[in-house]
Every structure is written in structure tokens, then in C-alpha cells.
Design a protein with these regions (language model features):
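Catalytic cores of DNA base-excision repair glycosylases
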Residues: 1-209, 215-222, 227-228
């Protein structure tokens, strides 16, 4: 996906799920032929097109302003030049725009431009906190450089996807399926949960989760990501 498409898609993904993000993105592309048309359109039309993503009254003007700001600075909406910049310089360029936080920038850099960046979404933030890969009180913003320092750059892509999968299928926000976790022995949080459930009897153990597998392997997965939090 071109970087400008990835940028708009990721802004739409903030505080929603993949399905609603995709519905809004496809609606926007169907309504307007180019990003220049989105940039110059009546804001109400843009807002109406992206309603499936939620927070349309905030996201619509935000997307248009980012598109205008990029045009003012670059003369076009082509972001391919970012691929030639050092990753930190490219990250700084993206995050100077209102509504483009570290996660949004990292997604554009990693998934569109092939840069070594590690996006931290809700799932990654939760899982890495539980297994001790980050300090408990570390903010999401602080987690980006911290986690990048822990993983070799060539593993960012696969690690990002696999931790998200773990968070969605097993290490869920409420009542995680710790008994199915492939790294349970490395997780004090999970071991404590298992001990509490064992003390409470069989009713404390959650039922089987469709799609969750005890044999989950940490391997490279199909190219898909994104998440449900902001920035």
C-alpha cells in the first residue's frame, strides 16, 4: 500500500477495529477518486464517507488537514521520499503533523516503506506489560523506542504481528486464556492467574476459544496488522 494510503488508513484505524477501518477506507476511496479530491472536498462529505470508522467528526478534518499540510510542504502527496531518509528523520517528519502519533508513524514506516519501526498498539502494549518486556508504568509513547531497543530490527515486522496475534487469541484484555499460552512459563502474570484459577476449581478455567491454539508458534505471519488504539 502506498505510504499516503497507509497514513490515511491508520488515522481511520484509531479507536476502532480493522473491519470498521476498512469499511471507512473503502467508502472514502469509492466517494473520491484521489487523495487530492479528499483534501479539497467539503468536510461534511468526507465525514459522511468515513462514518463506519467512528469519531468521523474528528477524523475527517484531521485527515484533510494532514493532506493539506503535506501538500503545502512537499507540493504533492507522494511520500515515497521518506523511504530515502534515515528512519528517525522519517519518523520525526511524520509525527510533526497533528493526529500522527508514534504508532501511526511506525505503521507507515514499517508496512509501507519497509523501515525498521515497531508499532505498539493496544495488544502489544498489554502483552509486553504482562510478560515483563516493559516497565508497568511505561506509557505507550515510551514503549515504542523501548521495545525497538529489545528486538533486532530485522525481527520488528514478525514480532509485531505475532505479539498482536497472541494478544487477540490468547492474552486477551479480560480473562486471558493463560492455559493455552505458548510462553506461559515465561510470564509471572500468567502463572499467577493459573494459580488463582487452580485454587478456585475448574470453573475458574475459561472455555476453549475458537481459533486459539496451544501450539501457537512465534513465526512470521501473513502481512496484516493494525489495531484499535489511537495515535
Amino acid at each position: 500500500m502506498p505510504a499516503i494510503d497507509e497514513l490515511v488508513s491508520t488515522i481511520l484505524s484509531q479507536n476502532t477495529n480493522d473491519l470498521n477501518r476498512d469499511r471507512a477506507f473503502n467508502s472514502l476511496r469509492a466517494k473520491f477518486g484521489t487523495w487530492e479530491e479528499v483534501r479539497d472536498a467539503d468536510t461534511a462529505e468526507v465525514v459522511n464517507a468515513i462514518r463506519p470508522a467512528g469519531l468521523a467528526n474528528q477524523k475527517g478534518p484531521r485527515i484533510q488537514q494532514v493532506l493539506r499540510s503535506i501538500t503545502e510542504e512537499r507540493g504533492s502527496l507522494d511520500l515515497a521520499f521518506l523511504g530515502e531518509l534515515p528512519v528517525e528523520e522519517a519518523r520525526a517528519w511524520l509525527t510533526k503533523f497533528n493526529g500522527v502519533g508514534p504508532k501511526t508513524a511506525a505503521i507507515v514506516l514499517c508496512f509501507s516503506l519497509g523501515k525498521p519501526a515497531f508499532p505498539v498498539d493496544t495488544h502489544i502494549y498489554r502483552v509486553t506489560g504482562r510478560i515483563g518486556l516493559r516497565p508497568e508504568r511505561m506509557t505507550v509513547e515510551q514503549a515504542h523506542p523501548h521495545l525497538e531497543s529489545l528486538f533486532p530490527p530485522e525481527t520488528y515486522y514478525a514480532a509485531h504481528l505475532n505479539i498482536i496475534r497472541l494478544g487477540r487469541e490468547i492474552c486477551t484484555a479480560r480473562r486471558p486464556y493463560c492455559e493455552k499460552c505458548p510462553i506461559i512459563k515465561l510470564c509471572d502474570y500468567g502463572m499467577n492467574i493459573m494459580s488463582l484459577r487452580a485454587a478456585g476449581g475448574s470453573e475458574a478455567t475459561p472455555a476453549s476459544v475458537p481459533g486459539a491454539s496451544a501450539s501457537l508458534q512465534m513465526k512470521k505471519m501473513p502481512r496484516r496488522r493494525k489495531n484499535s488504539d489511537s495515535s
